[in-house]
């Protein structure tokens, strides 16, 4: 791991999300569109955060450079993609969104965050789930997930898009 990289794990039931972090998450999310869905405003960031079980944050020199929103099966999140996993698995961790700053993409930051999350899955003996756009095709994300040994379980329509449902056990 990069010595200058620090990873912080927030638990929404315990940790408040500061205005500064909401702003940083919002900006990082918006910079990663269309790979990520847009968030409307800071309140939308807060709503997504409140659905999370964990929020993984990566900092370099105290600047947020990546985040991952993670939910378990008890979340009240209504996303159809999340609900797909909720209907098919008793217990799991679900990655709703991951964003890495342009300057730090393809430098192992995403993999480092995923490894931290997957360790929780190993401890609990549960799968790690997510989806990736296949229409339009997000080749970078698909390759990233397949390299980390995620398996595509099916492809599903999602509005005008299509997504591949992925799982790592």
What is each of the regions a protein language model found here?
Residues 2-43, 59-60, 64:
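Short amphipathic alpha-helix that is part of the acyltransferase structural core
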Residues 54-72:
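Conserved beta-hairpin
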Residues 69-97:
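Conserved acyl-donor/pantetheine-binding loop and adjacent beta-alpha core of acyl/acetyltransferases
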Residues 96-105, 134-135:
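A short, internal acetyl-CoA/4′-phosphopantetheine-binding micro-motif in the GNAT/acyltransferase core
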Residues 100, 106-119, 147:
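Conserved acetyl-CoA-binding loop-helix of GNAT-fold acetyltransferases
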Residues 121-134:
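Conserved GNAT acetyl-CoA-binding A-motif
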Residues 134-154:
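Conserved active-site alpha-helix within GNAT-family acetyltransferase domains
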Residues 155-169:
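C-terminal "cap" of GNAT-fold acetyltransferases
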């Amino acid at each position: 791991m990069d010595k200058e990289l620090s990873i912080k794990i927030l638990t929404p039931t315990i940790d408040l999300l500061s205005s500064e972090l909401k702003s940083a998450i919002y900006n990082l999310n918006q910079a990663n569109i269309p790979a990520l869905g847009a968030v409307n405003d800071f309140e939308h960031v807060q709503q997504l955060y409140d659905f999370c079980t964990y929020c993984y944050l990566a900092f370099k020199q105290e600047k947020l450079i990546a985040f991952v929103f993670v939910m378990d099966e008890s979340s009240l999140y209504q996303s159809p993609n999340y609900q797909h996993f909720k209907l098919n698995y008793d217990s799991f961790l679900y990655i709703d969104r991951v964003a890495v700053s342009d300057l730090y993409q393809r430098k192992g930051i995403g993999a480092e965050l995923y490894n931290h999350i997957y360790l929780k899955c190993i401890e609990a003996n549960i799968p790690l789930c997510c989806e990736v756009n296949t229409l339009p095709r997000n080749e970078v994300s698909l390759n990233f997930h397949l390299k980390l040994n995620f398996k595509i379980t099916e492809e599903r329509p999602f509005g005008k898009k299509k997504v591949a449902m992925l799982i790592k056990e």
